[in-house]
């Protein structure tokens, strides 16, 4: 509820005006039965046609005013609901954008998607319903009771005697319903995750003929959602029938008592007709209140889920740290890293790079190659040790300043459903010439010029209308476009043919001599010209040095080299040395 209160404050003026209009319209609705009773009991017996038409005209005017004011108030309620939800969705998206990677993993991407869509929709429904019916229903309920008390206090007592039972039932059931809707949203998160996995993994699923397996898995998740929704709705579904039961009992009692009082001459027929009309108004108001309880139950559960994300602390704090005087550009000083789940990935990684040097990183799958990049980008903080850039602890650098130093192509990087030009620029202000130059450097210009719209060619989500090599070259263009101080290429040439890969490495050597480069590759040919090569095994440094040094001294590097070249080049190199 704190979330709704906080975001509704800016619109308190508009809400107050809407409530006032709604209040006035509800009063017009309440006047209609009273006027009808007056016409039947007081005007018709006088047989004055003009008076009958006058009071009938008053009923028409009241009806028109009620309709117009309700329309205006409902439109204002919709605008407040729209703007409130828009503000919540904006702030939630902004918060999600700045969450650290560990926080994103803790909450879960499907859960974040669900909170940005389903939960914000539930809040939209809640805010709108509270303004439309949350104001009108109580006014009709209380106003109806007050007017009936002036018409016939005895009948009003019969009516009021039934209402506490309906209120107790509604409140009791709603208290049980809110936790159930929270549980339902968790199941929806699982459903979103399953759908997301199936959509993103469609090619793999089809290639392995696992469509039937995935269908069964989806059906299982769907059944869990249905079960959770059934439990929640079954609980809340008891509210309307109970309301009907209590109010119909009250209606029966009112009719019985009314008949007795009319026969005794204690009340008039017009009063009874008006009273039954008010009873119907009160009945509908109570039913509306029960519907409000259902909507509000969902809304409060969703508000709690959204608030839990908005309240997440900034766990990647910028600290104060002295600048160390050193010539090295990048320094890893005894860096170790363990994931929050306890899985140790890196241990005692220790190396330094001079400005303009190139570091190649190689190792088996799961050895921690990509984790080094994640730590350098400060997507995670080391569990132990320190990382410095130009003598500055990266934890002391503001994230926006830190990330501007890098040009990055990650292992599982993403292209967006925009044009090639927009994907390369990625929100940065580059001229078309700069973008074309970046594409040429990344060996992408040739295939881009063959496309119908060239740089304006629209891409599908994740660049699915490009080949693997084309996607990598567009990603490389994005990384090279800003002339970065540090270039990180994580397995960025795996889909390139050897000729293109060689041309790319030539460009990097000739045009990015002042750029410190970190290359992660599966092929030794992609990193053998690096100034330094880091060999990782099970998260630890197994070797560090030049290609020639590692080829002579490091068993793992030798095994990788021989596995990729068949040892032919090694034999030639050794023969050459023997002849010399």
Identify the residue ranges that each predicted region occupies.
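Helix-loop-helix
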Residues: 47-51, 147-161, 231-304, 309-310
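Transmembrane helices of ABC transporter permease
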Residues: 10, 14-27, 62-68, 129-184, ...
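ABC-type nucleotide-binding domain
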Residues: 325-580
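Hydrophobic alpha-helical transmembrane bundles that constitute the permease/transmembrane domains
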Residues: 23-31, 64-71, 123-126, 130-142, ...
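Membrane-integrated ABC transporters
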Residues: 1-29, 36, 44-60, 69, ...
